[in-house]
Amino acid sequence: MSQFKSRFGIDIDGTVTTPDTLIPHINKQYNTNIVLDDVIEYDFLSAFPHPVDRKEFAKWFKENEGYMYSVSHIAKDAKKILDQWQHQYELIYISARDTSVFPITQKWFEENQVPFHHIDLIGSHDKLEAAKKHQVEVFFEDKHDNAVLLAEELKIPVILFDTPYNRKAVPNTVVRVNNWLEANKWIKQHF
């Protein structure tokens, strides 16, 4: 019997970290002034005022992702809420990050004192199998299509952190929140 009441699946980027945390790095590299409100699709390139070669961007991102992840900013109140949850719920982070950045990711969690029980970097945005494997009972996400898929396929609630890039319609099992305090309020009412 587990010591935890429930298992939470939690995305990292844009959920535990601020959704705009990568933007200053992109602006510096591409000499742009993108802000989060410009990113209305889950695709930074959609916000550029000029065309950018996708292959070049992907190459630059891959070369710099470790550093960018290592200096990512934690979302307001995320640490406080996760600290409260760590003894009651099993915190399982499931991220699209590549496994090659696992040491950097774990170090970021430790340096920022963000509690975790397991970190699963799956290298793609398809989190369905990992969520099934870990038998999560609720998922915290910022990517619209992931939230909808997880909610519909697993029949679990998904907490969707509101951003300009995820404002499409969602089913009733996807609960849109503005911040970690609202997420915590929902969890207290339902878990």
Where are the regions that the model predicts?
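Generic structural signal for beta-strand residues in well-ordered domains
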Residues: 1, 7-9, 84, 112, ...
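Active-site neighborhood of HAD-like aspartate-dependent phosphohydrolases
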Residues: 1-57
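Generic beta-sheet signal
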Residues: 6-8, 91, 139
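Exposed alpha-helical structural elements
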Residues: 21, 40, 52-60, 81, ...
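Short N-terminal helix-initiation segments at or just after the protein's N-terminus
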Residues: 27-38, 54-57, 77-82, 101-104, ...
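Metal-dependent phosphoesterase signature
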Residues: 45-77
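Short, acidic loop-to-helix structural element flanking the phosphoryl-transfer center
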Residues: 66-93, 98-106
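C-terminal cap/substrate-recognition subdomain and adjoining C-terminal extension
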Residues: 87, 96-191
